[in-house]
């Protein structure tokens, strides 16, 4: 996507600067971030969630507590110049995650919208490409066991502790 190309150019510029001035440099590419305060369960309860129909559209996500753990570990083990994908172990469609949230909360299914009917350009752009990435390098390098290896553990925790 255009946004992805722009991000890659920015990463390359920063990497060049770090080499030029001999500075350590790490890039953390964050997947879709969710937390106890910002998540599909809250959107379902607030009546803001909609099912967006798009076949084979997957993206990776990560709970904010797992992001914090990775960043903490990066302070202890700081490679000279590296790029890491920060994500959980299970890319999933937004529909799959939303349906799991419905099951947890035992609420009615929200309105379904076909991808062609989205009005927001930002939403259309989001659903243009799948965004699933591998977290293998992150897990191997930092020796991390994610607290929330998938949205299932994350949403269960949020449901039991936050809402």
What residues fall within each predicted segment?
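Active-site Tyr-X1-5-Lys
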Residues: 1-26
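Glycine-rich "substrate-gating" loop/helix at the edge of Rossmann-like oxidoreductase active sites
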Residues: 2-4, 29-33, 54-64
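Residue-level signal for the nucleotide or nucleotide-sugar donor/cofactor binding architecture
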Residues: 5, 62, 92, 133, ...
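Glycine/proline-rich active-site loop of Rossmann-fold NAD(P)-dependent oxidoreductases
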Residues: 8, 21-23, 33-47, 65, ...
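A short C-terminal helix-loop "cap" of Rossmann-like NAD(P)-dependent dehydrogenase/epimerase domains
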Residues: 44-54, 105-112
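Mid/C-terminal beta-alpha module of Rossmann-like enzyme folds, strongest
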Residues: 70, 74-123
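Conserved C-terminal active-site "lid" loop/helix of NAD(P)H-dependent oxidoreductases
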Residues: 99, 118-145
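Amphipathic terminal alpha-helices
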Residues: 149-163
């Amino acid at each position: 996507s255009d946004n992805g190309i722009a991000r890659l150019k920015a990463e390359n510029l920063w990497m060049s600067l770090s080499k030029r001035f001999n500075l350590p440099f790490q890039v953390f590419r964050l997947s879709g971030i969710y937390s106890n305060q910002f998540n599909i369960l809250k959107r379902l309860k607030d009546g803001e969630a909609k099912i967006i129909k798009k076949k084979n559209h997957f993206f990776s996500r990560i709970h904010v507590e797992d992001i914090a753990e990775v960043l903490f570990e990066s302070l202890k083990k700081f490679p000279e110049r590296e790029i890491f994908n920060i994500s959980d172990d299970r890319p999933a469609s937004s529909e799959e995650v939303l349906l799991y949230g419905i099951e947890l909360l035992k609420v009615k299914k929200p309105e379904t919208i076909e991808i062609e009917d989205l009005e927001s350009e930002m939403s259309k752009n989001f659903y243009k490409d799948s965004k699933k990435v591998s977290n293998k390098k992150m897990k191997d390098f930092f020796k991390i066991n994610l607290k929330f290896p998938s949205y299932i553990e994350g949403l269960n925790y949020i449901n039991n502790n936050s809402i």
